């Protein structure tokens, strides 16, 4: 009787949040009865709540050894294993719990979540359907189903599941938060309301802060975005995504100490290689080559060889004009990680910059066998073919045939392109709120919109996206369907936009030569251009094709296109392209988009 009262006391303390007191009571019970399974299990739960997950797991396992037929013991072990990201073992624990207690709803929900963690979305959905077959009004099961569907790319069905869960249980912070996170990912304006509701209901952790940051960014509320991302970093200073996003937002807002939170986390975690590497990469992108190089040399000295560190150091050294040193580090990195896309890409870039096209060629061919539609490797295939004088270059880079220029007519509702572009320019001006260019892209001395234009409801933006459809179809009709040409073989069936954004070049603004890795067909549409672009000799602000990023003297541009308001240029995403700088105070404003074929 005394032991039973003490177990009840330990349980009450645990439910009151007094985990340490519960541990003490359980310890006293176990000193008298070392094989008391319930006390051992409570000890495991209490230790878990103190944050000692390892000891908690040991005690939960011990309690199961003592009484293996208790389904709730297995379910609680599954909860802790999932917290510890031991997903396979967590799934096994939940499955055992359900063998013993088939109607244990919490265990089935835990199993569905864990299967989702494992990427086993069909199995996760099946568990949700079992729950819903027993109770179609199970709001928790609907919220989990929404998560499963969202992870599987079924955004519409996921949204419907979340909204049904909220209708059944308006107090579900999980459903409100996950709906908001989905809408933020889709860059929809309703995300903010859902996330604010979740916060009022008590969602105040890392994911809530980060997703509020995303939603604020989409709403062009840059101050709120920074505040929320800073909160996310405060909650998880070692989170790479949050640190990277916060630093990039601060950089684009013109903050000279944009990486201060990351630098602080690196100082506190000097052995966290990925954090240190992220800081070096961001410093490099911001032009602070010396600081980035020093950090990586120190990291290699302290932690030893690391292909990711060496590859990034090689890229920095190339930018610093030291290609021989760069090649040494790049070769070592590629030898250690021969299948690493970015590692091999850095090596190939350095080899081509040094004029070693024959040395680069085997790496490119191997990567193309693995990823034949990779825009990066097609770009480098074309570069090597050009250097070596191979016919393949002209097949891939027929600039007259594959770079097409369309001068558009005014969309319905506007009397002229001048009137339309003036309205469009005013709309875009309101969306260009940053002070600096993105930290990790090819724009220099300019700004880029933060929200995709694809989800922007403004009528002028909807009108210009609609106006692009006819020239896109005309472009596609002119393409052959040769199986050995990457653009032609993709020209089958439907295609879709994968991104659309606006760029504003300011004084001395330009684009570094680049390709678009996430597209198949890319573009530039000119909204406003400065008067200096009319000079055909200087070619200020003109679009240029054929010059790689690290060009040899002979690899000069092979085609230029003059920007004009109302002009759309379409071209393969793998083509190297950039712009000449503009030099005056008038801005050059354009819209760009990428497209890919719809698969399956």
Residue positions per predicted region:
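Non-heme Fe(II)/2-oxoglutarate
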Residues: 395-490, 510
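Register position in tetratricopeptide repeats
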Residues: 15, 49, 83, 117, ...
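Catalytic core of non-heme Fe(II) oxygenases with the double-stranded beta-helix
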Residues: 455-469, 473-570, 575-600
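Short coil turns that delineate tetratricopeptide repeat
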Residues: 34, 68, 102, 136, ...
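Helix-start (N-cap) detector for alpha-helical repeat units in TPR-like alpha-solenoids
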Residues: 3, 37-38, 71-72, 105-106, ...
